[in-house]
Amino acid sequence: MFIKIFSAFRKGWKMLPTLELVYEKVKNRNPYEKEYLQATLEVLESLSPLLKKYPEYADDSLLERITEPERQIMFRVPWVDDNGKVQVNRGYRVEFNSALGPYKGGLRFHPTVNLSIIKFLGFEQIFKNALTNQAIGGGKGGSDFDPHKKSNGEIMRFCQAFMTELYRHIGENTDVPAGDIGVGGREIGYLFGQYRKITNRFDAGVLTGKNIHWGGSLARTEATGYGAVLFANSMLHTENKDLEGKTVTVSGSGNVAIYAIEKAQKLGAKVVTFSDSSGFVHDEKGVDLQLLKQIKEVERARVSEYVARRPEAVFYSNQKPWNVPTDVALPCATQNELTGDDAKALVNNGLQIVSEGANMPSTPEAIEIFKKANVKFAPGKASNAGGVATSALEMQQNASREKWSFEKAEAKLTDIMKTIHDDCMQTAEEFDDPFNYVLGANIQGFTRVANAMIDQGII
């Protein structure tokens, strides 16, 4: 498989032979894992300026070790549907790196899930978690189970079957899963219940994203979407601007998208789009957030239902929301959703800022186009780190048997996102590429993990 090496992530840096060799080794070991190879290549490309200045980071096969998971777990998940028929899905947990703390990363339930996607997400999670300055390593898990159109009973039975295998691999100081696509508060509850039954322990910190009534953290539900918007606002602050009066386009209509819309509206922006796999809605007057929440969170219906109740909005079937005039784009759906053609359309429609709410939603071609057009671009490992940062805050509350107010948790989230932004920007400036947030995020995250690995020896 051939993956073109793009120049979007660097300013005049040629990928060093050392890094090219590492990538070739990764590609030879994982020849069919395109998502994982894409994520690995993006990080390795960004490290050329670092290794040119500090070549010791290539010693003792550090790069080879950081690109190979510490542990990959794959297992069958048999469960019984409402018709009494046994179904079998595949479960995954990739425990990628624990140099900074216990493995931390979400569980994704979606029919497209495979080992490549889980490894790409876990690899990104290493550096995302490092950027938060919290004591957490990187991991990811999930299953090809599709919760769409499943009954509550079927989802409960699947979660119980999934945890029956997963429980032996996780723990408050070992590996702490959370939610992701297809895994919300309901699923976390079922997973925790089965863990508690099997172990006969109430280890609140073994999962995050719990209901606030039994160990969850206020502001955790909002954190990923809020964080992406806070990061975008910090990017605008570098130009003495903010989101007040700006037009914002959002993709997705799940948890991340909904709370990105909410935070953007609170900061004075007009959000005009949202989407799902069937198409997107354009509401030129501004999204009615309460209506959207009713449709997606209560009724679990398609976004097309929105226009039936708000006639001034328009639904575009099987299209994406990137051909709409906008100042700020927040891709919050899934990986590689925003292509080169989408990026061209956004640039032609006045785009200034991209802040990724999803994980790797922009293709390399899209990022290259943004770079050439001087559009400021924030990669998900930095801009959507608010979710895992607040998960770490939930772990802190569980460990101390405390429960913080929403205001306290949100204030900590705001501080963390500003620090991540400033650290990325300062690192990019240190390597003579101002506002290259991709380079800044990758180098900053990598050095924190690499330094810990060096200190702890070859293990």
Model-derived regions: residue spans:
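Glycine/serine-rich phosphate-binding loop and adjoining beta1-alpha1 elements at the start
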Residues: 110, 129-244
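Adenosine-phosphate binding glycine-rich loop
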Residues: 16-39, 235-236, 347-459
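Flexible, glycine/charged-enriched surface loops at secondary-structure junctions
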Residues: 34-37, 55-60, 133, 170-179, ...
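Rossmann-like adenosine-cofactor binding region
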Residues: 279-377, 382
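Glycine-rich phosphate/diphosphate-binding loop of Rossmann-like nucleotide-binding domains
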Residues: 211, 216-323
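Short, Lys/Arg-enriched N-terminal segments with co-localized hydrophobic residues
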Residues: 1-14
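Structured beta-strand/loop patches that form or line metal/cofactor-binding pockets in enzymes
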Residues: 56-85
